[in-house]
Amino acid sequence: ECREKFGKSFVYLGDEFYLLAEKQLPDASWYDGFPQIENGIGLSRSFIDEWQQIAAKTDVCNHSVDAVIPVGTSAYKILQPLLDNFNNKTGSKHSFIPVNNEFFGETINVTGLLVGKDILNAAQGMKRIILPAVVLNQDNLFLDDMSFDDFKKAFDGKVERAVNARELVMLLSR
């Protein structure tokens, strides 16, 4: 009714509502320019749209080591198929890894609330990890107060981070 009367909404459901209900995310136009993206509302749609646009232009990967990208368990279901298509197209074997949130509890399943220790536990034995930038704050700390530098020291491999889908595709392609 608000959309009909004013031409836009003022209430938006968080992405996790759609994911938990196993419903398709709304199109980007539904989010009215993403006014609440900093709260994670529309972040999945924005990421998917950007990913599809940039990945469509990528044919070959020159990577030497396949990467893992840690994500919340809710995001894994919608993101892994995108990466499977990318891998098939480019001949790579990258993967998203769903990380259980032991720190806050397993019902907390969004990527932005993952902590360094949980990510390290999920990525044991991996040689290359690309962290979503949303897991770090402006001081380069995870929510468990682990620093990015301490994470790099604890991880036995290459650590990179990506701010958005464009950066992620770029890192996966080299």
Language model: regions and residue ranges:
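Auxiliary Fe-S-binding modules of radical SAM enzymes
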Residues: 1-174
